[in-house]
A protein has these predicted regions:
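Generic secondary-structure signature for well-ordered alpha-helical cores
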Residues: 25-33, 63, 122, 181, ...
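A contiguous pocket-lining binding segment that forms or flanks enzyme active sites
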Residues: 126-127, 132-178
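A short alpha/beta connector and helix-capping loop motif
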Residues: 182-196
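N-terminal low-complexity or amphipathic/hydrophobic leaders
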Residues: 5-79
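Conserved small/polar residues in nucleotide/adenosyl-binding loops
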Residues: 197-204
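Extracellular/luminal Protease-associated
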Residues: 82-127
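Structural motif
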Residues: 31-33, 54-57, 91-94, 121-125, ...
């Protein structure tokens, strides 16, 4: 895995996500047509600075109760937290909601934002919903498919797998950059080169 230095991560975090997309069009022109979110999303905290980190991935459902034993589900949740904790830092959690339509129940709110922040995660990008916005962990960014009031029967399906969130395909350990506009995957091979092409450019 190609890891960036703290200075390079900080430099990328100083850019908004559209600027990163502009740079990718130069250093990896084939990615003009993929690798970023393409559907509208909601941002819980638009005033926060962009986040950039290594992807930790999972998939969820919420419309129906889980079919597995409660003991098994509890152990899976503990294994998932260990997975988040053991990954490279900083991290961004990317969660695909498998329900149709997505967002029936929120995995993310006051509890999960605080747990994940404590495990070194800067924020989440999800096709699902988020809730408890005023009470979520300070400085933790949440970019989601929708806001919602209930968690319904939300549960993990699996984790550490490839996911798709609003048109953006993400593999574990991918470098993800996100802000109020959405998110983009930065290929490790060109991540450093992106910083060479971040001067102001046309937005159209």
């Amino acid at each position: 895995m190609t890891k960036l230095t703290e200075e390079q991560l900080a430099a990328l975090a100083a850019l908004d996500t559209p600027t990163v997309c502009n740079a990718l069009e130069i250093v990896a022109p084939e990615r003009r047509g993929y690798g970023y979110t393409t559907k509208p999303m909601v941002c819980a905290r638009p005033s926060l600075a962009p986040v950039v980190g290594y992807a930790r991935t999972a998939r969820i459902r919420a419309k129906t109760p889980p079919q597995r034993d409660a003991t098994v589900m509890k152990q899976q949740r503990l294994d998932y937290y260990q997975y988040i904790d053991e990954g490279p830092k900083p991290s961004i959690t990317v969660i695909e909601d498998l329900d149709e339509p997505a967002g029936f129940g929120a995995f993310w709110g006051e509890v999960q934002s605080n747990i994940h922040k404590g495990l070194g995660c800067l924020g989440v990008v999800t096709s699902g919903s988020v809730r408890d916005i005023p009470d979520c962990a300070e400085g933790f960014q949440m970019i989601a498919g929708s806001f919602g009031p209930s968690h319904a029967w939300v549960h993990l399906v699996d984790f550490d797998t490839e996911v798709s969130v609003h048109g953006m395909d993400v593999a574990p350990m991918d470098i993800v950059h996100a802000d109020q506009h959405g998110a983009v995957v930065i290929p490790p091979a060109v991540a450093k080169d992106c910083l060479l092409y971040t001067s102001p450019s046309p937005r159209d």
